[in-house]
Amino acid sequence: MAKEIAKSLLDIEAVTLSPNDLYTWSSGIKSPIYCDNRVTLGYPLVRGAIRDGLINLIKEHFPEVEVISGTATAGIPHAAFIAEKLKLPMNYVRSSNKSHGKQNQIEGAKSEGKKVVVIEDLISTGGSSVTAVEALKLAGAEVLGVVAIFTYGLKKADDTFSNIQLPFYTLSDYNELIEVAENEGKISSEDIQTLVEWRDNLA
């Protein structure tokens, strides 16, 4: 499954690699990889495979889940697809409270006293996941864990989740993606060294 998802992400250019002409993330980090999983929404077969893959992760690791929660904004559609298939309540978590109305940070199903799984599109450092988890816990939820489409495999993410003692699982990761990209002839062996060094240095 990991390789199939990685191939799909590369094929539809949800993930692009540029070892010699780095991208600049919103955080200012210079990176040879850019991931925009919102692109998957335009490909029904890909988004369906992602939905089913995430559902399998949830059934395997968090079978007692009662509420599906998406992170705003890119996690929301995938959470909706999953909640619909599993016939479960769903909500989503903003990065901060609204500045108007009821000033809610969580919209949708009530979380208090419920076992919740958080849906992310991408895990880089784990920061957005922690924000969502903390908001849900504050609302009285029992957060079981996080599932996501892809992770860069950064040590910082591992440390982030370890610090809050929460498990996370992803459909694919950086190592799988690089391997698939090489097999597909999208990158050279020299590119792989650059990509691995970038990840290790950033970690």
From Swiss-Prot:
Reaction catalysed by this enzyme: orotidine 5'-phosphate + diphosphate = orotate + 5-phospho-alpha-D-ribose 1-diphosphate
Q: Which UniProt keywords apply?
A: Glycosyltransferase, Magnesium, Pyrimidine biosynthesis, Transferase
Q: Where does orotate bind?
A: 124
- EC class, as a word, reads transferase
Name of a matching Pfam family: Pribosyltran
For the ligand (5-phospho-alpha-D-ribose 1-diphosphate), the binding residues are 94, 98, 100, 120-128
User: What cofactor is needed?
Assistant: Mg(2+)
One GO term in the molecular function aspect is: magnesium ion binding
Q: In which pathway does it act?
A: Pyrimidine metabolism; UMP biosynthesis via de novo pathway; UMP from orotate: step 1/2
Claim: Repeat is one of the keywords in the record:
no
GO BP annotations, alphabetical order: 'de novo' UMP biosynthetic process; pyrimidine nucleobase biosynthetic process
Functional note: Catalyzes the transfer of a ribosyl phosphate group from 5-phosphoribose 1-diphosphate to orotate, leading to the formation of orotidine monophosphate (OMP).
Name the family the entry cites. Answer: Belongs to the purine/pyrimidine phosphoribosyltransferase family. PyrE subfamily.
NCBIfam families named in the record: pyrE
Q: What is this protein called?
A: Orotate phosphoribosyltransferase
